[in-house]
Amino acid sequence: MRKSIMIFSLLLALVVVLSACQPSPQATQPPAAQQTQPPAAGGEPVEISFMAWGAPEELAVWQKIVDEFQAANPSIKVTVEVSDWTSYWEKLKTLLSANTPPDVFAMDAPLYLDYQSRGVLQNLQPYIDQNPDLLKDVYPVTLEAYKTPDGYYGLPRDFQTVVIFFNKDMFDKAGVPYPQPGWTWNDLREAAKTLTQDTNGDGKVDQYGFTADLWDMELTWSEGIWSHGGEIISSDKTKTLIGSPEALQAWQLFYDMMWKDKSMPDTNTSGQYGLDLFQAGIAAMTPIGHWVVPGYATATFKWDVAPMPAGPAGQATSINSAGFVVAKGSTHPDEAWKFIEFVLSPTGQTRLTELGLAIPVLKSVAESPVFLKQKTVEINQQVFLDSLKFAHMKPVFKGYDEWSAVVGDGMATIWTGETELEPTLNDVVQQADAVLAKNK
């Protein structure tokens, strides 16, 4: 018996030694091929962290998504943190500087290259190559912002197209026809004039036909420039083109609506209200994205949405997305990828759509009742999808954050009435070009 045990022990030792000399099957596979295994009895699941910006109510939705993910993947535990926009980016920069980043974090598409070029993001292409069907149902235009020569370092989770929100009650009372497909900027301007009124009879305008955020390009002026045949930035990302003759036509339109027609409040006037002028029932029209729908659903007036108007070069709108990235410093990239896969699945996309803030990137979900027949409010959701036909991707380039601040802050004095349009615009273009040169 003792001899049998000794022989068995020697054989077992030999097997262990031989096994140790052989390469691990996982070691010879790309990262995406490594499969997360259920924890052993009594073992602890792998913990990963996920950070995103958003309103407090979004945390509950993300937690629901996480709960469903964990039920399907008991070997992984996800902790979720949702912060407001400013706090989110400040904390993210601090964590990256300390080399303690969240495993997965949300990314605004225009800022993507600033992070990707710093080498702080994991290349997701090996994972995608292992699941080539993953992106087949994703709207192609939403992927454009995340492409790089060596693959994707991020993927979109949802997107926004900008449309015109309009107050049906104001239109009805003023006898103005609702916006129709194919309408123009001239149509919008004339409607805005009629809808701008002194409803109290005290000689002061208290109802505006149109209001818009002119600081960032996404909501108004990029659409205006594209529809007039202009561009925002050159294809090689070295020249700012917002001062071209075509672009100037769009700027002049907004300038005249504000200072000549008085149908659009200047920055000082709108700032006095301290409110969303459309939601407060002070403005009849505003261009904005789907993220306002849950908030606007509580409005006491009837409203709907219409496509952006056409200019001399046709219709145009902006498309932007929120995406996912995995930190290069993550110690659990495989598990982080599994979470992204789940959010991009029909189940994950359905849960995000139920929140009502954005448009799902999966066609099968976006073009289903899940999106088109949302319960929050009865509006023409199809307009957001139809706008893809003439949508331009919001530009993505290195130095975007600094460039947009130079443009937004530089043009701000025009909308307060402190400076003239053309000389200010020319100065801004020079400053913006300097940012591009610095980030080339």
Question: PLM features: residue spans?
Answer:
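Conserved C-terminal helix/tail region of periplasmic/extracytoplasmic solute-binding proteins
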Residues: 34-42, 77, 172, 178, ...
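Extracytoplasmic/periplasmic solute-binding protein
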Residues: 39, 149-157, 162, 186-239, ...
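Extracytoplasmic "Venus flytrap"/periplasmic binding protein-like
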Residues: 64, 68-138, 172-175, 275-277, ...
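A structural signal for short loop-to-beta-strand junctions that line the ligand-binding cleft
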Residues: 95, 100-103, 132-170, 203, ...
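Glycine-centered hinge/linker elements that transmit conformational signals in sensory
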Residues: 191-193, 236-268, 297-299
